[in-house]
Each structure stands twice: as C-alpha cells, then as structure tokens.
UniProtKB/Swiss-Prot annotation:
<keyword id="KW-1133">Transmembrane helix</keyword>
<dbReference type="InterPro" id="IPR001694">
    <property type="entry name" value="NADH_UbQ_OxRdtase_su1/FPO"/>
</dbReference>
<feature type="transmembrane region" description="Helical">
    <location>
        <begin position="196"/>
        <end position="216"/>
    </location>
</feature>
<feature type="transmembrane region" description="Helical">
    <location>
        <begin position="274"/>
        <end position="294"/>
    </location>
</feature>
<dbReference type="GO" id="GO:0003954">
    <property type="term" value="F:NADH dehydrogenase activity"/>
</dbReference>
<keyword id="KW-0520">NAD</keyword>
<dbReference type="GO" id="GO:0009060">
    <property type="term" value="P:aerobic respiration"/>
</dbReference>
<dbReference type="GO" id="GO:0005886">
    <property type="term" value="C:plasma membrane"/>
</dbReference>
<keyword id="KW-1003">Cell membrane</keyword>
<dbReference type="InterPro" id="IPR018086">
    <property type="entry name" value="NADH_UbQ_OxRdtase_su1_CS"/>
</dbReference>
<keyword id="KW-0997">Cell inner membrane</keyword>
<protein>
    <recommendedName>
        <fullName>NADH-quinone oxidoreductase subunit H</fullName>
        <ecNumber>7.1.1.-</ecNumber>
    </recommendedName>
</protein>
<keyword id="KW-0874">Quinone</keyword>
<dbReference type="GO" id="GO:0016655">
    <property type="term" value="F:oxidoreductase activity, acting on NAD(P)H, quinone or similar compound as acceptor"/>
</dbReference>
<feature type="transmembrane region" description="Helical">
    <location>
        <begin position="312"/>
        <end position="332"/>
    </location>
</feature>
<feature type="transmembrane region" description="Helical">
    <location>
        <begin position="157"/>
        <end position="177"/>
    </location>
</feature>
<feature type="transmembrane region" description="Helical">
    <location>
        <begin position="120"/>
        <end position="140"/>
    </location>
</feature>
Length: 332
C-alpha cells in the first residue's frame, strides 16, 4: 500500500470516528443537560428509561425517527431542506483541524488525533463556523412563517455582530503566539500553568467565552428561538430528522467550542502536573460543557437591544483596547 493510499484511508477512518463520536455526544449531551438542570432546580431529571435514565437518549432518538417529516405548503422547499444540512455539516467540518488528544501508539502505529493538521487551523475553524449562520437564516426565510422569519433576522444580526468580537478576542493571543496552528498554540502553553493564555490574556478569554455563548445560541442569548417571544424561532416549522440536524449541529458546536477554549486558553492536551495530557483535556472540556449548562440554569434571557448594546458599546471597545495594549507590550 502506497503512502498516499494509507494517508487517505487513515483520514477517512478519522472522519468516521469523529462523526460517530460527536453525534453520540450530541445525544448524550441532552441527557446530561437535563440532569444538570434538574440538579440546579432540585429535580431528579430523566430516571425512568433504563438505569439512572441513561436510555432516555435512545427513547428520544426513536421518537425523533418516528415523527412525520412535514414541509409547510408555503415553504420554499429546496432551501427548507438544505438549511438543517448546513447546520450539521458546518459543525463537523469545523472540527477538521482540531487536535483532540496528544499522539498515541497502537500496535506500533503512531496515531495523531487530528483530521487535517493545517497551519491556519484556528482561522479555518472560525471561517467554517461562521458559515453556520446560513442555517438559521435560510430556515427562517424559507419557512413561510412570521416567527421563523423574525428568528432568521435575529440570527443574521446576532451572529454577524459577535463574529467581530470572536475574531478580535482571539487576535491578541495569536499576536503573542505568532501562529494560527492549533498545535502551535497548544505547544506554546506546555510549561507550567502560568504559561496558559487564560492568565496572560484574561480579558480575551472573557470576551471569547461570552461571544461563544452567543454564537452557540445558548441561554441567556438564545434570542433566535426564545419560546416566550418566537415559539421555536427559525425552527418552528421543522420536525423529525430535520429538526434533529439543527440539534446535532448545536451540540457538536458546543463540544468543539469546549475543545477550542481548552486548547487556546487552558493549556490544551499538555500534561497537567501528574495528570496525563489526554485526561487533562477531557477534564477541561467537561468543565466547559458543565459551565455552558450551569449558565443556562442561572441567568435570565436578555433582550435583543440589550445584547446589541453590550456587543457594540462594551465588548467591541474592550476587544480593541486589548489588541492595542497587547501590540504595545509586544512592540516596546
């Protein structure tokens, strides 16, 4: 077998593994979130289907597959069908340059847990993730429903505004590292905990994690589908597998964002004291996933005007100031 053929087979196997694992994690994420929310609200959460309610995910999946797939009469059919696919596809493509774990060896063969090691990895993630805006936007425009249309309009405003904050918040750490490769970013922090960028760029971390909440459409920033105002927003007319693809895309993005936060700001998969690197990054990712769910249980919704005011009048000046200060420190 030639080296090229072996590389192609290895890449295909990695893609299949990532698709299977993160699709399963998306389903398990719903169970975990319901358990966490139940804990904060002094409830038990899912506990009837299987031991500790673990088979609730399977029951939900069966229900989802069994639901009738309905397309509204006034919908623009091709775009209506395309929108959920964009949500899921962009979420998984964005994972290509993410190094999930350190290298390990199986039967003498060195495995690198990354699909594509490109030197502009973080730029690729941002570019592909930003294409995900087309999913709620097209869904809202094509559904023929006023609530969906308002949800799609909010998606365009919300995502485009916070793309600016996301990029500017990452600009300062990238100026320090002088590389766009996620592996280089990870290797930069391989010393002690004081080398983690969360301590060198705390403002950038705060801005990035808030922007991540907004772009993931998580509470308290889920203005695209706020139940009290828009029923289900852009997804009002979706059911069955099409709705499921939106949900898979959202949770896959959430896990990918947790990996990005761990890699860029929290030391990545470097050894953490006596804890091996692979276990260390899993602990960090689990912490950020729990944090996403904790915030949902804690904070009330914000209004769209409050969100835009926070973006343009507070976060944008802070992000620009952080870039300016970092540039001056590096220059002088």
């Amino acid at each position: 077998m030639s080296e090229l053929t072996g590389g192609i087979i290895e890449c295909i196997l990695k893609i299949i593994v990532v698709l299977l694992i993160f699709s399963a994690l998306a389903g398990f994420g719903t169970y975990l979130e319901r358990k966490v929310l139940g804990f904060f609200q002094r409830r038990i959460g899912p506990n009837y289907v299987g031991p500790y309610g673990l088979l609730q995910v399977v029951a939900d999946g069966i229900k989802l597959f069994a639901k009738e797939d309905i397309i509204p009469q006034n919908a623009i059919k091709p775009i209506f069908i395309l929108a959920p696919s964009i949500a899921a596809i962009t979420a998984f493509i964005a994972m290509a340059p993410i190094p999930f774990f350190p290298e390990f060896e199986i039967f003498g063969y060195v495995v690198r847990p990354i699909i594509a090691d490109i030197n502009v990895g973080i730029l690729f993630v941002l570019a592909v993730s930003s294409c995900g805006i087309y999913a709620p936007l097209l869904a809202g425009l094509s559904s023929g429903n006023k609530w969906s249309l308002i949800g799609g309009a909010r998606a365009a405003i919300q995502f485009l505004s916070f793309e600016v904050i996301t990029i500017l918040s990452l600009l300062a750490p990238l100026m320090i590292i002088e590389s766009l490769s996620l592996i280089d970013i990870n290797n930069y922090q391989q010393g002690s905990m004081l080398d983690w960028l969360i301590f060198k760029q705390p403002l950038a971390f705060g801005l990035f994690i808030i922007a991540a909440y907004v772009e993931l459409n998580r509470t308290p920033f889920d203005l695209l589908e706020h139940e009290a105002e828009l029923t289900a927003g852009f997804a009002t007319e979706y059911s069955g597998l099409k709705w499921g693809m939106f949900f898979i895309g959202e949770y896959a993005n959430m896990f990918a964002t947790a990996f990005i936060l761990s890699l860029v700001f929290c030391g990545g998969f470097n050894d953490w004291g006596f804890i091996p690197g692979g276990i260390a990054i899993l602990l960090k990712v689990c912490f950020f996933i729990f944090l996403f769910m904790w915030v949902r249980a804690t904070f009330p919704h914000v209004r769209p005007d409050q969100l835009m005011r926070m973006c343009w009048k507070i976060m944008l000046p802070l992000a620009l100031l952080n870039v300016l200060i970092t540039g001056c420190i590096l220059l002088f």
